[in-house]
């Protein structure tokens, strides 16, 4: 194994687009349209329209930074350039410690769709989730060229199913289903928009892969723009299908899109819906496992993570030490879930605040680093304001990044003390 060598540039434009889509288009597309419709009725489409417009600055703020400063550290690197190495390393650890929990949650969510559709129990759910995590780790170990190709295939399958679900919904869409337009008042539209925000972040994850882009300037900006448009259209069409058919009333708010998919397919509908959940969550895992392993590698390269996290595979030039760390974390989280010590409801709250803080750090860095571009600063400021407004809603999940900060500060203090003693 090699240590601290450069990563290979193997990610082209199609792979970059697929990785961006996979990072952002999570399992929320199956659940959130129904929840938003239940909350605000047909007026939820206004919230979707607003968030579809906001998606471009959210995406471009990360794309512009990735194009200008391609680095495996991603947001951590941007914050380092803007605010210093310690701030950058702390943000890097926020992201790194989010994925060991977030990826198993995504796997259990995706596996849950399939087991619910097929009537399987919790052991099958855990086994499927473990398989999804293994796929995510293996594809990233073999390399981003392979991971990118796998991601393209998975994303094509996801898009095909979502487009099919919209087509299947068309015959059942009626004008009467759009009235009354705002049955719960206009305030409910704002409340729905707050929930929808979580569906439109994730662009920061792929910034950690920018060092492996063949053409960072092109892949980061053009790739993220294309991906943002695709994601925005898919989310809006899914919401339109949900409202137009009133499936959130027939199939339940949390399974409205699954109800639409199952209607024209009969007995096969549940299986296809479950498979869609698996595909969507596997795409998310591939993107985030790749991002987390790269940020761990970058932190090790800077001396802010153990040296073994910087080990590269001799064969594939991928961060095998960091991938091993993720494998251990995934095993621990699945074991805790399987033993009943932690529920998926508890697990899902932990990474919320750390993901948002990572995004806030990246947007703040963009305001400082993109000063040569008025558009870049404006985009970064809009994204910063939007994410900062949502942060208070993370609630007690703020305790997780607070714990990470305390541990980071303690380790940094001990390292500084040891360095001072050594200098004497």
Where are these regions (language model features)?
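TM-loop-TM module centered on a large, flexible mid-protein loop between adjacent transmembrane helices
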Residues: 77-79, 84, 116-120, 225-288, ...
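Membrane-interface "cap" regions at the ends of multi-pass membrane proteins
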Residues: 1-34, 38-43, 47-49, 55-56, ...
């Amino acid at each position: 194994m090699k240590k601290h060598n450069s990563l290979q540039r193997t990610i082209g434009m199609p792979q970059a687009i697929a990785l961006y889509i996979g990072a952002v288009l999570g399992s929320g597309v199956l659940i959130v349209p129904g929840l938003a419709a239940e909350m605000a009725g047909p007026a939820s489409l206004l919230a979707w329209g607003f968030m579809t417009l906001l998606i471009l600055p959210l995406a471009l703020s990360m794309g512009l930074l990735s194009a200008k400063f391609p680095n495996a550290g991603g947001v951590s690197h941007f914050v380092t350039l803007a605010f210093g190495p310690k701030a950058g390393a702390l943000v890097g650890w926020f992201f790194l410690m989010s994925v060991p929990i977030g990826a198993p949650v995504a796997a259990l969510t995706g596996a849950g769709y399939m087991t619910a559709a097929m009537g399987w129990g919790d052991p099958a759910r855990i086994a499927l989730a473990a398989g999804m995590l293994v796929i995510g780790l293996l594809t990233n170990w073999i390399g981003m060229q392979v991971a990118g190709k796998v991601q393209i295939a998975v994303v094509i399958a996801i898009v095909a199913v979502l487009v099919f679900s919209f087509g299947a919904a068309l015959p059942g869409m009626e004008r009467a289903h759009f009235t009354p337009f705002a049955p719960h008042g206009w305030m409910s539209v704002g409340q729905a928009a707050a929930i929808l925000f979580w569906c439109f972040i994730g662009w920061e994850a792929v910034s950690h892969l920018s060092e492996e882009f063949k053409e960072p300037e092109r892949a980061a900006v053009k790739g993220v723009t294309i991906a943002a448009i695709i994601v925005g259209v898919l989310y809006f069409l899914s919401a339109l299908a949900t409202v137009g058919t009133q499936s959130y009333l027939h199939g339940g708010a949390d399974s409205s899109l699954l109800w639409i998919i199952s209607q024209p397919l009969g007995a096969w509908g549940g299986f296809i819906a479950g498979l869609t959940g698996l595909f969507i969550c596997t795409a998310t895992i591939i993107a985030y496992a790749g991002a987390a392993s790269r940020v761990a590698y970058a932190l090790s390269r800077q001396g802010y993570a153990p040296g073994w996290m910087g080990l590269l595979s001799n064969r594939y030039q991928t961060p095998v030490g960091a991938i091993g760390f993720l494998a251990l974390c995934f095993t621990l989280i699945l074991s805790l879930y399987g033993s009943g010590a932690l529920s998926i409801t508890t697990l899902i709250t932990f990474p919320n605040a750390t993901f948002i803080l990572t995004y806030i750090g990246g947007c703040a860095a963009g305001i400082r680093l993109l000063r040569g571009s008025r558009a870049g600063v404006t985009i970064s400021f809009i994204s910063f304001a939007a994410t900062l407004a949502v942060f208070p809603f993370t609630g007690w999940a703020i305790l997780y990044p607070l714990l990470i900060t305390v541990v980071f500060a303690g380790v940094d203090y001990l390292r500084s003390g040891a360095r001072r003693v050594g200098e004497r």
